[in-house]
Amino acid sequence: MLVAALAWVLFVPAADWLAHQDVGSATGTLLQTARDAARGRLLTLGAGLFAGAAFLVAARALVLLRRGQVNDRYTKAIEQLGSTELDVRIGGIYALEGVARDSARDHATVMEVLTAFVREHSREQWPPPDSPRTTWITWRGRFRTSGRQQERFTRPDVQAAVAVLGRREARHDIQPIRLNGADLTGADLIDANLGGADLTEAILRDADLTRVDLTGATLRDVDLTRADLTDATLRSADLGGADLTEATLRSTNLRSADLQATTLTRATLTRADLSSAFLGGADLTEATLAGADLGGADLTRARLFRTDFTRADLGAATLIEATLTGAKWPAGSPVPPGWKLDTRTGRLIAAAGTDPGPVT
């Protein structure tokens, strides 16, 4: 009935109105010809409207179909994630990555699921306590058997989840990646994009973070003992209280980073960019900063015992109350008051008859 009523309106009143608009008060053959022409135009318009409506209906159906397919894939992937089989869990992780890649609206949900998975399972021992004496080198895909006590590494499924997080489409993020408290000992984070991530109190001992992007990330009290951060970017990152004992930070960008009370004992910071960084109270005992840029850095109350500053740029650096005993001073840089340079070793020693204590 509705279609019939619409057709009557199109072909009778509307056609008459259009015809009169074309020929005015004419009658007879001229009026009939105008009516036929008007009906033709209305037919064309009606066909276009019908085709447009059909297209919209089909497009809507396709969207719903794809939405249903994505939901099915997501549900199946979640089921796989809860499997007791390692390979099935890893398959579920990569399936979730596919969902996030194909559906921007599901990106944030998938990333939250994966970060929760990492936080929940990363502290479980790997290899399992009841496994043979096999040490898995998960980030290289190799293993070796030895009579030594098992070493602990990141679980392969947790490693897979971290890898997915590290290569996600960050432009779809709604909130920062939260890996606070996660144990990623020995994890492979090479080239990972974790800018702005929260890694508070995470454990990254012996992890490989070569070229990782941690710009603006929160790494307070994180354990980075012996971690490799070569060419990494930690610009404006918060590393307050972090432990970087024996860590490698060659050519690492730490510009404007907060390193307050950070432990950098025996760390290697060759050619690192520490310009405008805050290292108040940091411990750099026996650390190597050869060729590092410390321009404008704040080293107030820092412990710099036997620290190697060879060729380092200390322009405008603040050394208030810093301990400099045995520090290897860069040639040409002014020696702080109360200290003198041992020309044989190139290290700072207390000036004769003085006890300089910390630099003030």
What are the roles of these predicted feature ranges?
Residues R171-T360:
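Tandem repeat scaffolds
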Residues M1-G52, R142, R168, P358-T360:
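Short hydrophobic membrane-inserting helices
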Residues V99-S103, F117, H121, V164-H172:
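Residue-level signature of the C-terminal ends
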Residues L81-G82, V118, Q150:
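Alpha-solenoid helical repeat architecture
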Residues A51-D72:
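Transmembrane signal-anchor/signal-peptide helices with a preference for the extracytoplasmic
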Residues T84-E85, S103:
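Short inter-helical turns and helix N-cap capping residues of alpha-solenoid HEAT/ARM repeat scaffolds
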Residues L86-D87, R155:
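Alpha-helix N-cap/helix-start positions at coil->helix boundaries
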